């Protein structure tokens, strides 16, 4: 059963890799939104359409350049941290219709794996899917963000564009050492709450 956010077209990639390690890559992609076979087999006996789910998962991973895994049926626990996060990103990108929230997607990863996840974020972004990236890693934020919402004392304190400010400026605004700039002009139709 889908959550209210998922039903609204919003997908999330969590810092703690919200995947089931013992399940396959394909099963994790469809966790909570399984496809059933047509006819009586699916409607009455609730038989899963494993082939359709595997084919879809394989295509989504291929689209994002992630088919370096041995098999779409291998257990997620056999993957590296970066590959696991890649599966989570692919799942979010496959089912999001509005935007993807990524909560510290590189926090538990090494340099090489973080690089791959940042490339995936850029790929998803290029495909036209908006991304809300929550991160304390300023180099990563500045690399992939179009706009940066800086929070201070649990409130939005400023919105900056990475091309207009340095990482040091962002940290200074965050800590209160620098006054926040006046609001930037947002694209037409954009709403900020």
Give each language-model segment a name.
Residues 1-193:
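Glycine-rich phosphate-binding loops of nucleotide-dependent enzymes
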